Amino acid sequence: MQEITPITLNAPLVLLTGAAGWLGGRVAAALTTGLPDAGLLANGSFRVRALVPKGEDISELRKQGMEIATGDLREMQSVRAFVAGAEGAVLIHMAGIIHPKNVAQFEAINTQGTINLVTAAQKAGVRRAVVMSSNSPVGFNPHSDHRFTEESPYDPHAGYGRSKMLMERALRAEVAAGSTMEIVIVRAPWFYGPNQPSRQTLFFKMVKEGKFPIIGSGRNRRSMGYTDNLAQGILLAAVHERAAGDIFWLADETPYTMNEIIEVVGMVLHEDFGMTVKPNPFRLPDIVGGAATILDATLQYAGIYHQKIHVLSEMNKTIACDITKARKVLGYAPKIALREGMQRSVDWCVKNGQSF
């Protein structure tokens, strides 16, 4: 258990979207019960109201004492109902879509849905909005030693990156126009941690079976964010005075090579959980990643999204960021590194019936 770091929220109400999701669920826990294993707890006399889509499992949110509003970011009526009576509140917007049924959903949800929410929140008198973005608006690093900063130019990769770029531009335009609501953008890369979706468990399974494809040398680097580290940064962005109107990268302390990520997952499975991990013979030439990138772009241009092709297109790319600004301005201090974070992730899978 980590030493507890309380973060005080001076607001009567916290509005939270994406609370039933992977990362949003950890933010929800930090706001309510706290995350003692990560040393994280939000202090203050505030209520938490979550916006969840129809059909989501809200049992855990109920246990945490949250107010529940059911609705869709694309429907202004439900968005207005969610922010009703929210004067002086803090909004933490985590909802979005990464792997859609079709490409059109990217902008409908990530871009227009966010604009709908921010517009309604401003009119309701919300004091500050913290909005989750991604590494995707800036694309891929030019080489493995390069790190993105908050000043890196936009160069989005495919539909998801474009939707997040358009979202960020709309938010920055609000800030430039003198928005009465403070707006903070936080960017997170590939994240990992408890409550993971099946796609992350499949990653573990492929590593265990020696079937995860390494494209190229495997020396390309990826920033990753353990979910509780990211939750810390999100709460700091919600409270720090100097965060208003700014953008921050949040991630683990340092990027990892793909070789290192796969090696650590294999070590955790074998050494910590006694699983047999097969050697990985799947090393494919860089041209496979290039071909996947072209195919992904072609399909998305036609409005088609294929998750496995899209993910494959990124596997030989460096996507790495510098968290110096978040450390200096927010006091962000990620406490959990790759080995411990992966151990906790696998432990959660084992305890929750996700088999490899």
Swiss-Prot record:
InterPro entries: Epimerase_deHydtase (IPR001509), NAD(P)-bd_dom_sf (IPR036291), NAD(P)-dependent_oxidoreduct (IPR051783). Its cofactor is NAD(+); NADP(+). Pfam families: Epimerase. Keywords: NAD, Plasmid. One of its GO terms (molecular function) is aldehyde dehydrogenase (NAD+) activity. GO terms for cellular component: cytoplasm. It comes from the Bacteria. Belongs to the NAD(P)-dependent epimerase/dehydratase family. PANTHER family: NAD(P)-BINDING DOMAIN-CONTAINING PROTEIN-RELATED, PROTEIN YEEZ. Putative nucleotide sugar epimerase/dehydrogenase. This is Uncharacterized protein y4nL.
